Every structure is written in C-alpha cells, then in structure tokens.
Curated annotation (Swiss-Prot):
GO cellular component: plasma membrane
Lipid bilayer topology: Peripheral membrane protein
Gene name linked to the record: murG
Protein known as: UDP-N-acetylglucosamine--N-acetylmuramyl-(pentapeptide) pyrophosphoryl-undecaprenol N-acetylglucosamine transferase
Superkingdom, natural source: Bacteria
GO biological process terms held by the UniProt record: carbohydrate metabolic process; cell division; cell wall organization; lipid glycosylation; peptidoglycan biosynthetic process; regulation of cell shape
Task performed by this protein: Cell wall formation. Catalyzes the transfer of a GlcNAc subunit on undecaprenyl-pyrophosphoryl-MurNAc-pentapeptide (lipid intermediate I) to form undecaprenyl-pyrophosphoryl-MurNAc-(pentapeptide)GlcNAc (lipid intermediate II).
Subcellular location: Cell inner membrane
Biochemical pathway: Cell wall biogenesis; peptidoglycan biosynthesis
InterPro entries: GlcNAc_MurG (IPR006009), Glyco_trans_28_C (IPR007235), GlycoTrans_28_N (IPR004276)
Residues annotated to bind UDP-N-acetyl-alpha-D-glucosamine: T11, G12, G13, N123, R159, S187, I241, A260, L261, T262, V263, A264, E265, Q286
Record organism: Aromatoleum aromaticum (strain DSM 19018 / LMG 30748 / EbN1) (Azoarcus sp. (strain EbN1))
EC number(s) per entry: 2.4.1.227
SUPFAM superfamilies (alphabetical): UDP-Glycosyltransferase/glycogen phosphorylase
Chief location bin: membrane
C-alpha cells in the first residue's frame, strides 16, 4: 500500500483542497496520513475524515513582535526536529504540501530525506513557505496561472458536490422575479459585509429588492439580525451553511471575500459574484485571486475601502439576470473541475517513479 503524507493546516482554504486530493488517492487504495498543527483548525476537521495524523508544533514565520523574532530559531528547530521524526516514522511514498505554516518544516525535511515532494499553491500570490519549497520540490502545482515560475496550473481542488452543480444555463432557465442574493462571510463572518449589505438592501425599492440569504458566522449572527431589523429588511440569516453547493446553485449573485477556495468554487459552479477582498491578507493575495475572475468578466471586484451602502446598492440595482448569466457562464469557463484528480495523478507518477529506482 502506498502512503501519502498531506501537509496542510491553518485555514479551510488549505485543508479542504487537501481533503479533496486525499479522497482521490484513498479511493485508489492509498494510506493517508495528515501532518498539521495540533492547535490548528485541522485538528478538528481532519480526524472526521478518518485519516491518521502527525502533529508538528510550528507557527508563523512572519511577525512584528520582538519575542516572536527572538523565538524564531527555536520554533524552526523544534518544527524541523518533529517533522523529521514523523517522516521517518511514516515513511511516505509521496509528500504533498497544500499550504499552511506546517508545510515548511515538513517539506524541507521531506527533501532532506529524498522523499518525493509535491507543492500546491492555492493563491494567486505564493506564500513564503511555498516560495522556498518550490526550489526543492519535485513538482510544483498552482491554483492560478503564473503564480510560480515552474508551476503547472491545475486549479484548486474543490469538493465533488461543488463540481457536480449543473451549468449556469440549465440553472437559470425559467428564472423570473427578484434576484436571489447569497452573501457569504465565511466561518468567522465578514463584519464589513454584515454591516453594509442590509443598509444597501434598504436603499433598493422593495419591489426590486433581491431575496437574500446571508451567512454571518456564528459569533456575529445576533448583530446581523439586529442590523437587518434596523434596516427594515428581511432575509434568511444563517450562522453557517452546510450545503454550499445548493446555495451557490440557487443564487443569481454571490457577495463574498476572495479566498482561493471561494474563487475556485465560484468558477466550478459557474456563479456571478461581487468580490470584496480581505484587505489585510498576506501579500494582498485576495485581490489577485479576485482579479482572476474580474479581469475575465466573471465577477465584480470592489475593494473594501470603496465599499459603502450606496455604491453596493447601485451595483445590485444595475444588474439584470441575463447579464448575471453571462458572468456565470464566463466563471464556469475558467473552472478546473478535475484539479483534485490532476494533483492525485502527479502523486501517482512520482510514487511509480520512486519504485523504479
């Protein structure tokens, strides 16, 4: 049985694409082991999928605090030592880095031991760890074109239910009446969207006002309910959404941030979107992610400093369903629906090459 060591953690944008690839290879009979941080989101999500785990304590490489800088050498040393021990224990046929701080010590130790290393960069701007690992990896893959010099563009893996959503022309057929608006704030909620969207909807004549579903984040749900009540606007307000595929499929327009996984899902589904990049993302990578869709007519890009209720209301009022269908169709044309399979195939090829040596 071949063994894949997946290294990913920190955010769902790293973890869920890793799960998509892991499921591909588990279906082909591979053993899956996941390297992550025991204090990260992966510690809750990964065991739910039944994978073996290998925990490495390793945090951010960047930081302004003096203490963080002073402790960096110790942080690196501990991370390298723990990763080396786990790699020797697991003896993987292939090591796959999907992003997050833990990929750095794990990837460097994989290269040191001569284990085949695949690096996948999800964002339009490569992170620090992946920029370093690209120099020692056997294969470098990317979710966006032109991210790293020697990267093969395969797209970002998305869940099977997202990739299986019907195309835009089939979904939009027979639609009439008010537009359906889906607002997605993410697991923590996007406070600026929670504040601005109800005020924008209140500016739109009730006869034209979209039917809205707004995912707020559990901690911000009560504040969102108060904001909608104050604005005199009705909406389906949710702390989280389990079935994103169905919600995407029903929406005429999605208003959201521009994380790599979100952008990949919008393309896979074929959904028109208004993207408000998180302005404090490392290297402003969310703006680059959003531009991938916006530059090709598949999305509107609205920088957060320019976001206000009046402008948002004006954009929504100007949109007709046929134009949104055109945007959705352009988004779908940019999809890489077989990204998970492509990454899995690269792992298969490296494992086969290793056995021949």
């Amino acid at each position: 049985m071949k063994t894949l060591l997946v290294m990913a953690g920190g955010t769902g944008g790293h973890i869920f694409p890793g799960v998509a690839v892991a499921e591909q290879l588990r279906g082909r009979g591979w053993r899956i082991v996941w390297m992550g941080n025991p204090d990260g989101m992966e510690a809750r999500i990964v065991p739910q999928h039944g994978y073996e785990t290998a925990w490495v304590h390793f945090g951010a490489l960047r930081g302004k605090g003096l203490l963080r800088k002073l402790l960096l050498p110790l942080n690196l040393l501990r991370g390298f030592w723990q990763a080396l021990g786990e790699l020797r224990r697991i003896r993987p046929d292939v090591v796959l880095g999907m992003g997050g701080y833990v990929t750095f010590p794990g990837g460097m130790m994989a290269a040191l031991l001569g284990r085949p290393l695949v690096v996948h960069e999800q964002n339009s701007v490569a992170g620090l760890a992946n920029r370093v690992l690209a120099g020692v990896a056997d294969r470098v893959l990317s979710g966006f074109p032109h991210t790293l010099k020697k990267a093969g563009w395969v797209g970002n893996p998305v869940r099977a239910d997202i990739a299986a959503v019907a195309p835009p022309d089939a979904r939009f057929a027979g639609r009439s009446g008010p537009l359906k608006l889906l607002v997605v704030g993410g697991s923590l909620g996007a406070a600026v969207l929670n504040d601005t969207v109800p005020k924008a909807l209140a500016r739109i004549d009730k006869a034209q006002r979209p039917i809205v579903t707004h995912q707020a984040g559990a901690k911000q749900l009560e504040a969102l309910r108060a904001a909608y009540a104050e604005a005199g606007v009705e909406g389906e307000l949710l702390p989280f959404i389990d079935d994103m595929a169905s919600r995407y499929a029903e929406a005429d327009l999605v208003v959201c941030r521009a994380g790599a996984l979100t952008v990949a899902e919008l393309a896979a589904v074929g959904a028109a979107s208004l993207l408000v990049p998180f302005p404090h993302a490392v290297d402003d990578h969310q703006t680059g992610n959003a531009q991938f869709l916006a530059d090709r007519g598949a999305a509107y890009l609205l920088p957060q400093p320019q976001l206000d209720a009046e402008r948002l209301a004006g954009i929504i009022e100007s949109l007709a369903r046929d134009h949104l269908l055109d945007m959705a169709t352009k988004a779908r044309a940019l999809a890489k629906p077989r990204a998970a399979e492509a990454v899995a195939q690269v792992c298969e090829e490296l494992a086969a090459g290793r056995k021949k040596k």
